[in-house]
Amino acid sequence: MPKQAIIPAGTTTPIAPFVPGTMADGIVYVSGTLPFDKDNNVVHVGDASAQTRHVLETIQNVIATAGGTMDDVTFNMIMIKDWADYAKVNAVYAEFFPGTKPARYCIQCGLVKPDALVEIASIAHVGNKA
């Protein structure tokens, strides 16, 4: 099964050996996405809502580069640093998935940088649009 790297224009260079997304057989696998700027610094420090929006906009860009939309997302894996931010993360999340919601799981865990409050990885079925 051939796979294609999905790297949107202007994407941050990852700090580890991976790409923002990979597509195989019309399925886009979006890597764990953190609230980073172009220099891999955490943005919106202390604001879980703004960090969630930044992460979901980044994921949206990866999926769009593959020819899809957020409506194509079928599964999300959400990691939050502090369970107290759960409602804030959900409020922003709901804005990006107003129709049929994707399946998902959400866990509390430590993240790669101390100021990061949320990380999301996604799977989207876009077909062969790209």
Curated annotation (Swiss-Prot):
It is an enzyme of class 3 (hydrolase). CDD domains: YjgF_YER057c_UK114_family. Keywords: Hydrolase. GO terms for molecular function: deaminase activity. One of its GO terms (cellular component) is cytosol. It catalyses: (Z)-3-aminoacrylate + H2O + H(+) = 3-oxopropanoate + NH4(+). One of its GO terms (biological process) is nitrogen utilization. Pfam families: Ribonuc_L-PSP. Its EC number is 3.5.-.-. It comes from the Bacteria. HAMAP family: RutC (MF_00831). PANTHER family: 2-IMINOBUTANOATE/2-IMINOPROPANOATE DEAMINASE RIDA, PROTEIN HMF1-RELATED. Belongs to the RutC family. Involved in pyrimidine catabolism. Catalyzes the deamination of 3-aminoacrylate to malonic semialdehyde, a reaction that can also occur spontaneously. RutC may facilitate the reaction and modulate the metabolic fitness, rather than catalyzing essential functions. This is 3-aminoacrylate deaminase RutC.
